[in-house]
């Protein structure tokens, strides 16, 4: 990190620079008490205040900015822009590969414009964990892990060689190889410092990450959040992150959770509360006496779900529990002493008696939390477990009946247009016939839509599938697999289930993908692996797997039965996202649940199940076995944690974390400061963003004669815009791979090909569940191509190429919460590469809006209360947008004037709100994007 980022060159207007002595070590620090007013700030804003004090340069960060945060008005709407300099950047491989591709391309662009390519180097430590590429091709047997890793290397060798080149070519860039763990778990267990030391200066650890669940580290008191890959690249290159001083929601925790309630239940309850309250763009900070009762692992689970709450961060302050966790996970005694001394010196140590001032207040009595699941399509759709069967029976109608009306939804909820119901099926209602000994998902189906399908399977025997069958049960995802209480709870439940003679249903694809190798160690030490394996939960891989759609194919006979009979089947996973189409293309309904409940639903085999009154099976004596009979007690879980987890597990697991296995070490790795691009590569291609870029930006211009590429509904996620999953044969992305000699079995996923813009542009707006309202009853990556007579249906990519040839700019129209979900920079990159100049919506989710600006696309909002529907816009119009050119004079217009001319010549006119929110964002937009801005600044500073 450059000296200006550590504080060595701070202007120090407040005389805050001082020395902190801990043991026999002395550190330079910037004391917050030098700035009056900071003592009353919430913890999260103290971290920001210190950041500004230390990086004050008189230009980007001034004395006024520091005073603005010290005098923070909790009741004001955010309006003051500050420049936050994160201490480090963390990445996963799907988003990290394109970052390193961009940096490699920037080196060449700098050289081409006469600069020094070695100027392009991370100034902040950057760490990348490879966790997104492992796919569960093999499951349910002892060879699953080894075989899945083998296949991962076969598919991804090119990408991994490229990352190894990057590790050698760039300073301060490290890669954690595949098969180690999930990025956020590796972050809390090893990478996070809580207090950083660099150049002799001690300061709070902060980070930005190229994954929206970066907020997991908030549980350790580390302020950090997900940003798009483009912002992460800029942060690596020393650019501060532009932000408004946020509102902070104080979330008071009191009471203790009841027996039988898990951390997952707490986080689903908090998600539900915060979504209802509305926390988009705000910090959430937990406080109160109840904080001490929340184990660090549970804090990390709560922090992890911040994107699902809608908040920028969801943070816990530092206290004794933080220190205990750092000790358990193998941090040094010197580090522990520094964290405690620094936090106490800066007023950052949690004092339960002191109530900071917050903008808004919420409270949860933990004793009121009940077991819950969430589904069938959004994390905030919480269902109490006692009501799960009823809720499923209501929801199933939306997936099996034609034109079933979707109930009216609240402002922030998805509507029919965005998330289509399935095609109609032939409905039948169950009759009680003669008993059948085959396992069946249609038992007790009276009163709900049912379509029993007999499946013959050589491996699994004969069984009956039906609507609601659980075909995926995944213990997966960073959210829960780092949490010993739920992971050991699940394993103890498995032990009791096996002892009672229960088994997982034959149609369930099981998955166990822990977030780090430590989980495997404590399962082994506790002697619980054999029970999990008996129920089918063999180690499948250390990575995201099911949670990001790397579920792998369902067994062929099951997939065929589902698709031939249009069954609405379900997945249950211990993840954080359950959007439609995300988990598996065969599965329509997805539910989030705690790891123990994942196992329970795998045994039940259907969502049409009431755990209170329906037995999971019978024991050897024929007695009914209910969930309550196998649920482990809190005392059992605590005893197992105490006897099976120790510090040595962490120190041994992470001793050689960057070294990798033989496969990693034997990868042939190119060398040199610039990368030798392979023109035949279908994984890694030189990025096109700097092609023909002049040293000075050209003026921005108004948009004239634009056409609509897509007219979309509410809650369109970044996964709809740039899916990460499988590449469908026959689509433009598949056609490109076919033309380049790639066999269908080697297509791999869109996420794994993010280093190749040719594949990614063809995959943009290509999610199988996306509904473009320019077309009736069509899902997937299609639009109308108005360059052709009559505007026929065409692939979005093919139409965009025709518009490009004709010199016609494009716009996208959307609804509420456009761009929610993952911090997926390709959702913005793909948009700009398709020729889209503006996106007009009712509202944007935070990260995607800033990513669009970062790629030179202007985000606009309909006037308050208006929408495409209310303005009677159907997407066939031609659009002129005037007022953008005002940006050339250094001013950002509040609105621009949009004229939509219909085919009959009539006009619809409105003033769209310009969502360029800060002066820094205006600079990026004027330069055509953030990377172009950084590159031009680099050239200026090297002259």
Swiss-Prot record:
Cofactor(s), names only, from the UniProt record: [4Fe-4S] cluster
Pathway(s) annotated for this protein in UniProt: Carbohydrate metabolism; tricarboxylic acid cycle; isocitrate from oxaloacetate: step 2/2; Organic acid metabolism; propanoate degradation
Gene Ontology biological process terms in this record: tricarboxylic acid cycle
General function of this protein: Involved in the catabolism of short chain fatty acids (SCFA) via the tricarboxylic acid (TCA)(acetyl degradation route) and probably via the 2-methylcitrate cycle I (propionate degradation route). Catalyzes the reversible isomerization of citrate to isocitrate via cis-aconitate. The apo form of AcnA functions as a RNA-binding regulatory protein. Could catalyze the hydration of 2-methyl-cis-aconitate to yield (2R,3S)-2-methylisocitrate.
Enzyme Commission numbers on file: 4.2.1.3, 4.2.1.99
Swiss-Prot/TrEMBL keywords: Iron, Iron-sulfur, Isopeptide bond, Lyase, Metal-binding, RNA-binding, Tricarboxylic acid cycle, Ubl conjugation
Cross-link named Isoglutamyl lysine isopeptide (Lys-Gln) (interchain with Q-Cter in protein Pup), sites: 394
RNA-binding as UniProt keyword: yes
Name this polypeptide is given: Aconitate hydratase A
GO MF annotation list: 2-methylisocitrate dehydratase activity; 4 iron, 4 sulfur cluster binding; aconitate hydratase activity; metal ion binding; mRNA 3'-UTR binding; mRNA binding
Alphabetical list of NCBIfam families matching this protein: PRK09277.1, PRK12881.1
Reactions this protein catalyses: citrate = D-threo-isocitrate; (2S,3R)-3-hydroxybutane-1,2,3-tricarboxylate = 2-methyl-cis-aconitate + H2O
Family of the protein in this entry: Belongs to the aconitase/IPM isomerase family.
Listed SUPFAM superfamilies: Aconitase iron-sulfur domain (SSF53732), LeuD/IlvD-like (SSF52016)
Keyword Transferase annotated: no
InterPro entries: AcnA_IRP_Swivel, Acnase/IPM_dHydase_lsu_aba_1/3, Acoase/IPM_deHydtase_lsu_aba, Aconitase/3IPM_dehydase_swvl, Aconitase/IRP2, Aconitase_4Fe-4S_BS, Aconitase_4Fe-4S_dom, AconitaseA/IPMdHydase_ssu_swvl
Co-factor binding comment: Binds 1 [4Fe-4S] cluster per subunit.
Top enzyme class: lyase
Binding-site list for [4Fe-4S] cluster: 478, 544, 547
């Amino acid at each position: 990190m450059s000296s200006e980022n550590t504080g060595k060159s701070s202007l120090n207007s407040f005389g805050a620079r001082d020395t902190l002595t801990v043991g026999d070590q002395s550190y330079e620090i910037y004391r917050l008490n030098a700035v009056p007013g900071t003592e009353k700030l919430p913890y999260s804003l103290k971290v920001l205040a210190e950041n500004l004090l230390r990086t004050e340069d008189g230009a980007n960060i001034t004395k006024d900015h520091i005073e603005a945060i010290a005098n923070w008005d909790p009741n004001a709407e955010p309006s003051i822009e500050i420049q936050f300099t994160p201490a480090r950047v963390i990445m996963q491989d799907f988003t990290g590969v394109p970052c390193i591709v961009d940096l490699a391309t920037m080196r060449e662009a700098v050289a081409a414009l006469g600069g020094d390519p070695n100027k392009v180097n991370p100034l902040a430590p950057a760490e990348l964990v490879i966790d997104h590429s492992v796919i569960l091709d093999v499951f349910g047997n002892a060879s699953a892990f080894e075989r899945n890793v083998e296949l991962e290397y076969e598919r991804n060798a090119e990408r991994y060689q490229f990352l190894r080149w990057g590790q050698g070519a760039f300073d301060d860039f490290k890669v954690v190889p595949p098969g180690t763990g999930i990025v956020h778990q590796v972050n809390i267990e090893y990478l996070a410092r809580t207090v950083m030391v660099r150049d002799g200066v001690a300061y709070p650890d902060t980070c930005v990450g190229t994954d929206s669940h970066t907020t997991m580290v908030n549980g350790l008191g580390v302020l950090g959040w997900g940003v798009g890959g483009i912002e992460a690249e800029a942060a690596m290159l020393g650019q501060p992150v532009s932000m408004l001083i946020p509102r902070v929601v104080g979330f008071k925790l009191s009471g203790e959770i009841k027996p039988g309630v898990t951390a997952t239940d707490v986080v689903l309850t908090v998600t539900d509360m915060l979504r209802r309250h509305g926390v988009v763009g705000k910090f959430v900070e937990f406080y109160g006496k109840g904080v001490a009762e929340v184990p660090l692992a549970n804090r990390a689970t709560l922090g992890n779900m911040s994107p699902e709450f809608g908040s920028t961060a969801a943070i816990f302050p530092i206290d004794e529990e933080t220190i205990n966790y750092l000790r358990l996970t193998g941090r040094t005694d010197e580090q522990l002493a520094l964290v405690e001394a620094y936090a106490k010196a800066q007023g950052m140590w949690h004092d339960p008696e002191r109530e900071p001032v917050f903008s808004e207040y919420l409270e949860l009595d933990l004793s009121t939390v009940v077991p819950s699941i969430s589904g069938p399509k959004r994390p905030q759709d919480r269902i109490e477990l006692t009501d799960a069967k009823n809720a499923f029976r209501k929801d199933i109608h939306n997936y099996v009946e034609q034109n079933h009306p979707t109930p009216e939804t609240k402002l922030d909820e998805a509507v029919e247009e965005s998330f289509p119901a399935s095609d109609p099926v032939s409905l039948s209602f169950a009759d009680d016939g003669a008993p059948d000994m085959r396992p069946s998902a249609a038992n007790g189906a009276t009163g709900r839509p049912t379509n029993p399908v007999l499946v013959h399977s050589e491996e699994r025997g004969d069984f009956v599938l039906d609507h609601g069958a659980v075909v995926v049960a995944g213990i997966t995802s960073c959210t829960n697999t780092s949490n010993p209480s739920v992971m050991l709870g699940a394993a103890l439940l498995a032990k009791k289930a096996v002892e009672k003679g229960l088994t997982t249903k034959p149609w369930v694809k099981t998955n166990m993908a822990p977030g780090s190798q430590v989980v495997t160690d404590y399962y082994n030490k506790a002697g619980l692996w054999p029970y999990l394996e008996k129920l089918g939960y063999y180690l499948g891989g250390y990575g995201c797997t099911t949670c990001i759609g790397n579920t792998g194919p369902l067994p062929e006979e099951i997939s065929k039965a589902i698709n031939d009979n249009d069954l609405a089947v379900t997945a249950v996973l211990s993840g954080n996202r359950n959007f439609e189409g995300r988990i598996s293309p065969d599965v329509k309904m997805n539910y989030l649940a705690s790891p123990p409940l994942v196992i329970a639903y795998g045994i039940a085999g259907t969502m049409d199940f009431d755990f209170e009154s329906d037995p999971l099976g019978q024991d050897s004596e024929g007695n009914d076995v209910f969930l309550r009979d196998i649920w482990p007690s809190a005392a059992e879980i605590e005893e197992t944690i105490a006897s099976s987890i120790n510090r040595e597990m962490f120190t041994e697991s992470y001793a050689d974390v960057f070294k990798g296995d033989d496969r990693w070490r034997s990868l042939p790795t190119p060398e040199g400061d610039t990368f030798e691009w392979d023109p035949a590569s279908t994984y890694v291609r030189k990025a096109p963003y700097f092609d023909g870029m002049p040293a000075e930006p050209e003026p921005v211009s108004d948009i004239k004669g634009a056409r609509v590429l897509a007219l979309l509904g509410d809650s369109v996620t970044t996964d709809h815009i740039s899916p990460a999953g499988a590449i469908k044969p026959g689509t433009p992305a598949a056609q490109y791979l076919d033309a380049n000699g790639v066999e269908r079995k080697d297509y791999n996923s869109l996420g794994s090909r993010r280093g190749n813009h040719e594949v990614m542009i063809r995959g943009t707006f290509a999610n199988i569940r996306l509904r473009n309202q320019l077309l009736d009853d069509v899902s997937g990556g299609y639009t109308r191509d108005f360059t052709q007579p009559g505007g026929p249906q065409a692939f979005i990519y093919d139409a965009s190429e025709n518009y490009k040839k004709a010199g016609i700019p494009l716009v996208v129209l959307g609804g509420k919460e456009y761009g929610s979900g993952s911090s997926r920079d390709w959702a913005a990159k793909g948009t700009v590469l398709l020729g889209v100049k503006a996106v007009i919506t009712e509202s944007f989710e935070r990260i995607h809006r800033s990513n669009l600006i970062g790629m030179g696309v202007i985000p606009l909002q309909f006037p308050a209360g208006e929408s495409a529907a209310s303005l009677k816009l159907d997407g066939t119009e031609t659009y002129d947008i005037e007022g953008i050119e005002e940006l050339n004079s250094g001013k950002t217009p509040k609105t621009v004037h949009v004229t939509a001319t219909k085919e009959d010549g009539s006009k619809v006119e409105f003033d769209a709100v310009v969502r360029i929110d800060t002066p820094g964002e205006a600079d990026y937009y004027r330069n055509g994007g953030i990377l172009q801005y950084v590159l031009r600044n680099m050239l200026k500073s090297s002259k």
